[in-house]
């Protein structure tokens, strides 16, 4: 070690786990506010579960032979007590676990929603990350196709609220367990006839999860998959009536859809209705929301037999679409940036900034970066860059006279003058600023 300090290696974030920086946070806040307003309109209540759960929750709930459980989970052994734990790769199983554990269904069905980070160990690419965010709904205790239709309609309403276009709905029915079992037998027989043409992934799934072979993206297998037995042809009267009821409700609400017999979803807990919202604007990662019915899951995780359905959507993918379609809202600046010169002015500025905040105004008070006072010119540059509507200026003369100078940074002032600096008594500052902001807003509406 020399006398000179060695330069420390710069630390970076984990690949596929991204920072959300201030310039992007406004878009996240816009989306979150929009979706929360929508969910309130449908009577959904927020639930928040831990990001770490017992591994068994996912192996039992999602399915041991799914891609998520086999190769995508971040799992570890707790050094304190030897428990096998996992960073949640999805949240439906966790919400169901919480509902069972806290007896949430004792007094009837529940409409729940969540928003938060999920984790999957996979190759990062556009729209697919190792830490990603999902918003989702879980309608617990609802058995009819009307619940399926409602959660699908929620998605369409969200696209409308966000201004998104070109997102198309695909639906399918996975039927009941006995129907899937009969289809599985015939599907395996069919795929065995083409086993020499199947890729490694399809061969691995052939006897463990053959339904997932139908979801392959390998171009070389598309003809084989296209001619495979379709689960929809194995549906019994109950499953078909449920699927027909869903279609009738979607048509009644003028919501176009396509029946995709190859739509199977990657989680074992689904039955009856499954659906995806897809777009061609995100390349290979075209699914922006997906869900369906999972009636067996609550009993599977230790609860009483209870019907349920829900969906989840990838927040990052939706934000990509908003950027793609130039629907990013302009970030609003604060109301006031307070500038000051001299010790007496700094003290007075501090007091006034707090008083302005008491009235509900958003205020940035200039604070020195190096302990020394910045020049007036430098402070005004920062005020302008902050996006503030007004600069409130304290100098030695203003402090001596009990006044402040107010300079509009956007639009006009209280009297209609554009960017004209005015002297205002300190005791009248709040009223002046409110009137000035009203005038600015009206000027912007003209």
From Swiss-Prot:
Primary location recorded for the protein, binned into one broad class: cytoplasm
Coiled coil feature spans: none
Enzyme kind, highest EC tier: ligase
Biological process terms in GO annotation: histidyl-tRNA aminoacylation
EC number: 6.1.1.21
InterPro entries xref list: aa-tRNA-synth_II, aa-tRNA-synth_II/BPL/LPL, Anticodon-bd, Anticodon-bd_dom_sf, His-tRNA-ligase, HisRS-like_core, HisRS/HisZ, HisRS_anticodon
CDD domains, per database record: HisRS-like_core, HisRS_anticodon
Catalytic activity: tRNA(His) + L-histidine + ATP = L-histidyl-tRNA(His) + AMP + diphosphate + H(+)
Pfam families: HGTP_anticodon, tRNA-synt_His
Localisation: Cytoplasm
Superkingdom: Bacteria
Keyword tags: Aminoacyl-tRNA synthetase, ATP-binding, Cytoplasm, Ligase, Nucleotide-binding, Protein biosynthesis
GO MF annotations, alphabetized: ATP binding; histidine-tRNA ligase activity
Cellular compartments per GO CC: cytoplasm
Family the UniProt entry places it in: Belongs to the class-II aminoacyl-tRNA synthetase family.
Assembly behavior: Homodimer.
Protein's UniProt name: Histidine--tRNA ligase
Native source species: Burkholderia mallei (strain ATCC 23344)
